[in-house]
Amino acid sequence: MKKEIIIIALVFALGGSAAAIFLKSGWDKKVAPPQEETGFWENEEKTKLTIENVEFEVEIAQTLTERTKGLADRTDLCSQCGMLFIFEADNYHAFWMKGTFIPLDIIWLDKNWQVVDFTAFAQPQAGRPDEELPIYRPKTPARYVLELPGGTVEKIRGFKVGSQVELER
C-alpha cells in the first residue's frame, strides 16, 4: 500500500512539474516576426497586403490558439479578405480543412514575403473523419501562410510562385 501511495505521489509531482514547464513556455505567446519587424504585429488584429497589385485586408493569426482556429466555422469570406498566419520559423507548415465551410486558396510565403508554394481551391470536407482529411503542405519551407477565398489566385493576373507580397506599414 505504501509503495502505491509513493508511486501515485511521484506521478502527481512529475505531472505538476511538466504542466508548470508547459505553462511557462509561452506556448500561446505572440510570435515575433523576423528581427527587422520586431513589434510590428504586437496588438495587431488586421493588416492590408497586396499581391500583384490586388489589395486584401487580412486578419492576423499569431498565437497558437488563433492559428489552430484559423477560418474554421466561417460560412463566408469577402473576396478581398483572408487570414495571415504568422510563424516563428520557416517550416513545412501543414494545413487542413477541419471545420472549414468555404473553399480556400492556401499560399505559403518565405521570410521575405515571396510566394514559395500554393494550393488553389482547397475544398471543405464536412462530415469526413479527421483521419481522412487531406493535409496541405508546401514543397518549400515557409514562414507565413495566407488563406484567401477559393479561386482568388486564379483571378490575380500574374500570380505565381515567386510573386511578391507587399505589406502596408
Language model regions located:
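Compact, glycine-rich, soluble single-domain proteins
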Residues: 2-7, 19-169
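Catalytic phosphate/metal-binding cores of nucleic-acid and nucleotide-processing enzymes, i.e., regions
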Residues: 9, 14
